[in-house]
Amino acid sequence: MQFSISRENLLKPLQQVCGVLSNRPNIPVLNNVLLQIEDYRLTITGTDLEVELSSQTQLSSSSENGTFTIPAKKFLDICRTLSDDSEITVTFEQDRALVQSGRSRFTLATQPAEEYPNLTDWQSEVDFELPQNTLRRLIEATQFSMANQDARYFLNGMKFETEGNLLRTVATDGHRLAVCTISLEQELQNHSVILPRKGVLELVRLLETNDEPARLQIGTNNLRVHLKNTVFTSKLIDGRFPDYRRVLPRNATKIVEGNWEMLKQAFARASILSNERARSVRLSLKENQLKITASNTEHEEAEEIVDVNYNGEELEVGFNVTYILDVLNALKCNQVRMCLTDAFSSCLIENCEDSSCEYVIMPMRL
């Protein structure tokens, strides 16, 4: 069995697929990628048993259809180091793969293709399409609030929720919450799942910034996304996500509105002298003025005064400045609204002109 392919056609899909592989898999065959040759098309598949990625590309020639495995990292390193215009020929004989290009020749050990695991076929409960850039924006707007290696395993991921014609992503680590909602062109049944953190990071890496379609299939145990030449599949977290609606403050009495760029720069400067561990800053509000102060264990201090629209009572409250900057970097807008109730309440932050994304940050003790 033999096929030929240009380096240009092979490198990108191979890199994408190798990205989902584990560095130390429990099963030796998972060090490999699966190669499926059919009608001059090559499908490359990789998995770590949690996330699976398949990517298709065009062959220059093939002697017959077939399915084989090849060591992923070694094959990728060989392809990466060949010259840009290289033509690569791969020949499979028994338990060996011969990779040739010009005067270069490599013999690699393979594993039986039938031993390669795959996430079995499953029935999707929700199936719809949306532009890739829309899905990417949904994920990027909320992913920074995901927990990382939290004992509450259901927080180590992102909630995907369909409700009528709405698609929503939600992420929280217990200290902050991010919710982003978009409208779809079709009505869907109400359904929600939790995509693991690794699945979220791999998926957003695949999504383009154009309006090419992405087809989402959401099942009970898996989520699958079909892109142009790529199919992404991830297992889901079996757990109950917190009721985020109870966290969103709806009766805030103290409303602050200010310029996004000015606030972002002020918080960024104040953060330089904030405590390295706590990362706390003090927000002091009075009529049409926000004062941001920070200090650290070396008794160094920073103070920033920003003009804002505020007509409530004077108020002092503390927040983690990293959390605030994460929100501001995600918003990228003209005017920002901050909604508070008192010095002990959470703060809701949103774009003044677009409430599709909402962010909640818990206060810190001053």
Curated annotation (Swiss-Prot):
Localization: Cytoplasm
Keywords of this entry: Cytoplasm, DNA replication, DNA-binding, DNA-directed DNA polymerase, Nucleotidyltransferase, Transferase
Q: What InterPro entries does the entry give? A: DNA_clamp_sf, DNA_polIII_beta, DNA_polIII_beta_C, DNA_polIII_beta_cen, DNA_polIII_beta_N
**Mind telling me which GO cellular component terms the entry cites?**
cytoplasm; DNA polymerase III complex
One GO MF annotation is:
DNA binding
SUPFAM superfamilies to which the protein is assigned, alphabetical = DNA clamp (SSF55979)
Q: Which branch of life, at top level?
A: Bacteria
Q: Which Pfam families match?
A: DNA_pol3_beta (PF00712), DNA_pol3_beta_2 (PF02767), DNA_pol3_beta_3 (PF02768)
What biological processes does GO assign it? DNA strand elongation involved in DNA replication
| Protein family | Belongs to the beta sliding clamp family.
Known partners and oligomeric status: Forms a ring-shaped head-to-tail homodimer around DNA which binds and tethers DNA polymerases and other proteins to the DNA. The DNA replisome complex has a single clamp-loading complex (3 tau and 1 each of delta, delta', psi and chi subunits) which binds 3 Pol III cores (1 core on the leading strand and 2 on the lagging strand) each with a beta sliding clamp dimer. Additional proteins in the replisome are other copies of gamma, psi and chi, Ssb, DNA helicase and RNA primase.
Function description: Confers DNA tethering and processivity to DNA polymerases and other proteins. Acts as a clamp, forming a ring around DNA (a reaction catalyzed by the clamp-loading complex) which diffuses in an ATP-independent manner freely and bidirectionally along dsDNA. Initially characterized for its ability to contact the catalytic subunit of DNA polymerase III (Pol III), a complex, multichain enzyme responsible for most of the replicative synthesis in bacteria; Pol III exhibits 3'-5' exonuclease proofreading activity.
Q: Which protein is depicted?
A: Beta sliding clamp
What gene does the UniProt entry assign to this protein?
A: dnaN
